[in-house]
Regions:
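Acyl-donor (CoA/ACP) binding surface of acyl/acetyltransferases
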Residues: 1-36, 71, 75-190
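Conserved GNAT-fold acetyl-CoA-binding loop/helix
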Residues: 33-57
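A short helix-loop-beta-strand connector motif used in the catalytic cores of GNAT acetyltransferases and
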Residues: 55-73
Length: 190
């Protein structure tokens, strides 16, 4: 369910990280436009490789009852290039919740890839894994990402505040949530 995971959409192939993705993921997270909206440092190539090996190990440990981390590469079918990543995992500031996250190369923004990839992942999470609720957090300045979440049916819950000092980078983020019922209703209406 997690190790051999594959999703095909009209334009994308979504699959677990592979070590051959390291240099593309490294270049992606170095893009200033992308990194600006990610509350993490820019990692070295070696650190990216370590994250990939760790992600492969996590996929072996993931289960329907507990997703430790589910990191996925987004490949554009036409070019066969890695253009981004998405995934599911515990929220850093609310460990009991599963969070959707994604990032795409700046040169692909505005083409609907984020919506296409995350919609497919949510469909899998709700219909196959059996999750009931998924959250997402986004910086208020990231209007394009807010639009993606709203298009998917996520509803704004609150602004993240009063976190402990070690989580200060998440302070002020907007917290969104979607239920299985709402997502599947929205999918039927399309």
């Amino acid at each position: 369910m997690f190790v051999n995971f594959q999703i095909e959409t009209e334009r994308l192939h979504i699959r677990p990280y592979r070590i051959c993705d390291a240099s593309a993921l490294y270049e992606l997270q170095k893009q200033p436009e992308v990194n600006f909206y990610i509350p993490e440092p820019v990692y070295s190539l070696k650190e990216i490789e370590d994250i990939i090996y760790w992600s492969i190990d996590m996929n072996k440990k993931n289960s329907v009852n507990h997703i430790a981390k589910f990191n996925l590469s987004i490949i554009e079918k036409a070019s066969q290039k890695l253009i981004g990543y998405c995934g599911l995992g515990p929220s850093d500031f609310e460990l009991t919740s599963t969070e959707l996250y994604y990032a795409l190369s700046h040169d692909t923004w505005g083409k609907g890839y984020a919506t296409e990839a995350t919609s497919a992942l949510l469909q899998y999470a709700f219909s196959i894994i059996g999750m009931e609720t998924i959250i997402a957090s986004v910086f208020p300045e990231n209007k394009k990402s807010i639009h993606v979440l709203e298009k998917l049916g996520f509803q704004f819950k609150e602004t993240v505040q009063n976190l402990e000092k070690s989580l200060h980078e998440y302070e002020g983020m907007l917290y969104f949530q979607i239920s299985k019922e709402l997502f599947l209703q929205k999918a039927v209406l399309k």
